[in-house]
Structure formats: structure tokens, C-alpha cells
Amino acid sequence: MKYRLWACLLFLPMVLWASGRPKVAVVLSGGGAKGTAHIGALKVIEEAGIPIDYVVGTSMGAIVGGLYSIGYTPQQLDSMVNAQNWKFLLSDAPNPKDVLLDDRLKSERYVLSIPFSLKSAAVSDAGIIKGKNLARLFSTLTEGYQDSVDFSRLPIPFACVSENLVNGSEVVFHEGILATAMRSSMSIPGVFAPVDLDGMVLVDGGMVNNYPVDVALAMGADYIIGVDVQSPLLKASELKLAKDICWKRI
């Protein structure tokens, strides 16, 4: 992907200079764990000398884009991804530092705990993972932007996409609490609990707009640099596992 990006970006700085500096947006698609490839793409764009005026993302693209928009460099993002305890983050386990040794040993026997309701025998909160640990991480990483803010006033103007399960509509975040917007955009249905916000039930934006070029254009972009890491469509016979169906949503 790096070489394809270089081929596409090689002459763009000259085009921008000749055109009187039009606005450039980077659009980052959803794509599950493959979304970390967005970090490498941003590094290539920077190395090519392309100015970035807007960042728009969905799902994992919203996470990378949101952090990049407030000043994280690709190198910092890469280090952050590699330094995380993903088993802990992708669970509702308490922080090991706050757990007694006996309880910690019991919890480490299981990769994933599923909270069932004894009354209804259903998975609680419409998702296996409530996402508290991820939400806490996002809040920490966005320190200084924890109040409701206008995303157009971030160091790089930003927007991300979610879906309102109440009516199936697309929700584009242009303002609000940045960590909440990022968490809403990657709430994979059936995996992460949705985010309740202002009467909406928000989940991963991948089904309504997984590659939000239109959002970037509406923000004022003249040129779009799109980074699409979506998986190719699977045949019906290939959708055999629940994880296949879940990941196809992003």
C-alpha cells in the first residue's frame, strides 16, 4: 500500500501549489484491526509533503483520525498501538493493579467474559463488551479535549460517522466530546455496547458510511486522499462464523 500511495501522491504537492492551495482531506475507512494501516498511510502523506486540512473517518478510521487531528504524530500513534494491552482493552476486566491476586488469577483463565442477565438469559447492554476500558483509554488520550468542542476548531478539523440504531440514520459528529464520538463510531453491533447519547443509540458507522468521502467534500475539501482498508465482499457460503458477520459490518 505504501508504494501505491507514493505513486498517487508524487505529483500532488505541485498540483496544489499550481492551483493556489486548495483544501485537502484525508478520509480513513473502517476496517477492523486493519485500520492500523491508516497510521502508515498518514506517515507516507506527511513524507510526501502534503498538507492536510481535514480528517474524516469511520470506525477504526475515526480512532486514528481523531487522535491525529489533535496532534498525535504517526510515530506516536504507532508506539501507542504497540504499547497497549489489547486483551485488557477489549474486555471489561478491572485494571489488574486494582484487583486482588486471587481474583486476578481467576479472571486470567478466560480470554473473554460475557455478562448475561439471569432474568432474561440475554447478553446485557446489547453487546458482549461494554467498552469501559477503551472509553477510559480514549478519554486519557484526548486529555485537553474532554469538554464538548467544535471539531472544526481542532488543530486539524475532524469529523466521524456513526449509525443511530433507533432509525438507521447516519450521524456525523462535527462537535461534542471527542472521546465519545470516537467510541460511538467503532461500537461494532453485538461486540461492543452501543453508546446512548441524546436519545440516540449509536453504533459503528460502517454500515451507513464506511468510506465518508461525501462528509469531507461537505466540509470544504477540494482534493480527497482516501485510505480504504475495507475487506472484500464475502460470498454467502463464506459467512459461516459470527465473527465474519460482525467484521463485515466494519
PLM features: residue spans?
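Patatin-like phospholipase
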Residues: 18-58, 66-250
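Hydrophobic h-region of N-terminal signal peptides that target proteins for export
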Residues: 9-18
